[in-house]
Regions:
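Non-catalytic signal-transmission and effector/linker regions of two-component phosphorelay proteins
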Residues: 1-66, 146-166
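Structural beta-sheet core signal
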Residues: 32, 116-117
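Conserved phosphotransfer microenvironments
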Residues: 41-44, 64, 71-77, 85-112, ...
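General small-molecule cofactor/ligand-binding pocket signal
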Residues: 67-70, 140-141
Length: 166
């Protein structure tokens, strides 16, 4: 038993990694696709950028991402043409918005761009999502009004982006 363990330990490759070489891929620009009501609710208790900045400072993290909010497909494509985004957060409203259609089109055009669903908890959205193809999304999150969830989403996607390297 001990011999087998020694053999397995020899097979492992350990290397020193400098701290500066960890987390080389980061999220700097986030595109938030939401209807005006959901965007307002998200910012109900303060600007997203300010809250994220304060949360990053409290956690001793550097380089908080910038958020760009869009409401329509036209605004989405204009921003995607002019800015390099690292993450797209889609907030499908309870109305018949085309958020999922926009997300599908983004994934076709930018297949490596991570897409996340952030949805308020409601029965109508739950029923709607049951009929949607969610495979294009990295994750689906239920938002209950706490913007701290955005920091967690960003850190989760960054960890996933750096998994192979770190």
């Amino acid at each position: 038993m001990l011999t087998k363990l020694r053999i397995k330990l020899r097979q492992l490759y350990f290397k020193d990694t400098q701290f500066a070489n960890l987390m080389t891929k980061r999220i700097f620009n986030v595109l938030l696709v939401a209807n005006p009501y959901d965007a307002f609710m998200l910012e109900d208790d303060g600007r997203i950028d300010e809250k994220i900045f304060n949360e990053y400072m409290n956690l001793s993290l550097r380089y908080p991402p910038r958020f760009t909010q869009v409401f329509t497909a036209e605004e989405t494509w204009e921003q995607l043409r002019n800015t390099m985004f690292d993450l797209v957060i889609c907030m499908p409203g309870s109305d018949n918005s085309d958020t999922f259609d926009i997300a599908r089109d983004i994934k076709k055009e930018y297949p490596h761009l991570p897409l996340v669903v952030l949805t308020p908890f409601s029965h109508g959205i739950k029923e709607r999502m049951e009929h949607e193809d969610l495979s294009i999304f990295e994750y689906v999150f239920c938002w209950l009004g706490n913007t701290d969830l955005l920091v967690s989403i960003i850190k989760l996607i960054e960890d996933k982006m750096n998994l192979e390297h770190d």
